A protein has these predicted regions:
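Terminal targeting signals and extreme-terminal segments of soluble enzymes
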Residues: 1-257
């Protein structure tokens, strides 16, 4: 591929494979994590499959991605199927499969999604934008952790950076940072889905202990439409996340961008 293509666009590039809603993609090293691709780029590829589908109604409203197994390096196949289409909403089932050593397709990721036609009505928010310094005066933090996908994002932490001392001291799990794609790229639904998984595991900050952790399931709600995303351009987004419950080997977090 041409080097003029943004790494995100290379990573979510899908080729139709004949049957409607069937696509083939290829993992890239640009978004590689410890044992597979960064979870956000997998979510972005699923959003791309929906938007590329000839029967797609409207724009993404939400997507839930369940990471059943690590996606291996190489080819993968996506099936995106609209199971119900209403006047304003459309409901989707998606799977990602890869061949095993015998060549049999094995499910590695499942997802559900909703797309919708947005109509102008009353709107409001109960979550105010925090007062924080602009990204121009917050220094960029060099990539942390030694995995390639961290090089794909410009991160400028305000609060809750990854622990500098792993001493087991418990603290609040809130992280705030300015973040955007690196190199800069105009914001769209695929990029926003990718950004939604940018937060390191809350348990690391909460306990300051090196604990094996990975995303099992993520849900993204797209409250912004095409116009709002276009207005954001290539600028930074303020991102924040906080854990809510840590129990019996699992934990959650609530995040906003």
């Amino acid at each position: 591929m041409s080097t003029d293509i943004h790494p995100l666009d290379q990573a979510v590039a899908l080729t139709p494979t004949g049957a409607v809603g069937h696509y083939q993609g290829q993992t890239t090293q640009d978004y590689w994590n410890m044992v597979g691709p960064y979870g956000g780029i997998t979510a972005a590829a699923l959003v791309q499959a929906i938007q590329q589908h000839p029967l797609c109604l409207g724009d993404p409203l939400s997507i839930t991605v369940n990471y059943a197994a690590a996606l291996g390096a190489g080819r993968f196949d996506i099936e995106a199927r609209p199971v119900r289409t209403n006047r304003s909403t459309q409901h989707w089932l998606l799977t990602i499969t890869q061949p095993d050593q015998d060549g049999d397709a094995q499910v590695v990721t499942t997802a559900t999604a909703v797309t919708a036609v947005r109509r102008s009505t009353w709107g409001g928010t109960d979550l105010a934008m925090p007062e924080v310094p602009s990204p121009a005066v917050v220094p960029r933090v060099p990539p942390l952790g030694g995995v390639e996908w961290l090089n794909r994002y410009d991160m400028r932490f305000l609060d809750g950076i990854i622990p500098q001392t792993w001493d087991g001291r418990e603290t609040d799990s809130l992280t705030r940072l300015w973040v955007r794609d690196e190199p800069p790229r105009a914001l769209d639904f695929c990029a926003l889905a990718g950004l939604a998984d940018v937060f390191f595991p809350r348990v690391w900050l909460r306990r300051a202990q090196r604990t094996p952790a990975g995303t099992v399931s993520i849900t993204v709600y797209f409250h912004a439409g095409r116009e709002e995303l276009a207005a954001a351009g290539t600028g930074h987004l303020l991102a924040q996340a906080r854990g809510q419950e840590f129990r019996n080997g699992f934990f959650d977090q609530s995040a906003q961008l």
